[in-house]
Amino acid sequence: MNLLRLTLAGTPVEMGRQHGRQIKPLRPHLLAVIEQRIAELRQLGADNPAVVQSCLDFMAEADRPLLAYLAGLSEALTIEPRRLQLYTLSSYLRDLWRAQQTIPSASPPFVQEGCTVWAASGPATADGRPLLVKNRDYHADHLPLQILAHVAPADGYRYLSIGSAGSPEVFSSGINERGLAVADTHVLSRDIGPGLPRFSLMRELLTHHDSVASALDYLRSVPHMGAGTLMLADAGGTLALCESGHRRCGYVISHGETALVNTNHFETPALAGQWIEDEPPALRGNSLGRRRHVLTALQQGWGTVDLPWAQRLMAAHGSPQEALCR
């Protein structure tokens, strides 16, 4: 699939305007997606104005680059700023609503995003160089919106990112000019609250950090919104997984002695009990199954892992419980 390529440079508001101008052909589809998400929130009663405002108040203090970017984007697309903000927060608002349901089976199940991410380096790979790999399994209506952005911030490292038209610039994954790479997955979690969303954390990592060690120092110093994971790899081969929660986070670090794999549940003691599995019966267990599938493949392919190997693995279909490409 050919991704629409964006070129963004300057301040956050300037890059937001550039983003909006460069995706004008996608505007009708984007508007339809925005209206659908907002309608879903309204139907659930998940669009509580006080909750939305608490997030925006936090961002006004701690994440001004995000609000500036969205302001430029809404201006270029002539979308009412509040609607774009609500759309940007829609995943968090839906998760918060879901986490507050007392009886899991009393609420309708949602097909959760099925992204799979892994990283390997050193003795695991054919040439010793690090690999960070992701299958992006997101909303089907985002397929036409997928973008590859070349980003040159006014202050910071240049980077490439994969994301969605109409969303913040690092909405899925990226790598900067110093070789720091990051990719996220979503986890439906009870441990969520006002904080920095994953796309803002990834933006800051790519803009200002050049190693996993530096990235982890940053992640430990700021409040997280939660509800997901971040996989990190740097040019030196250090790997790390951050399981992101609002009240606590879990971390796993590897210097190449082990590969790291994450899907859509938590594994660390800090957060394992916060995961909510809420999928239709046919897909129950698929996050655990996908992780197990990749771990087994990496063990069997140890020392031979390279880009073609990774592409073959991530194209694997199979049963609903272990298919990596869905």
Name these PLM-found stretches.
Residues 1-114, 206-247, 257-326:
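C-terminus-biased signal that marks the final domain/tail of proteins
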Residues 143-149, 242-249:
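Surface-exposed flexible segments
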Residues 91-201:
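Internal mixed beta-strand/loop scaffold within catalytic domains of large alpha/beta enzymes
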Residues 121-127, 176-178, 233-237, 244-246, ...:
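Short acidic-glycine loop/turn motifs at beta-strand connectors
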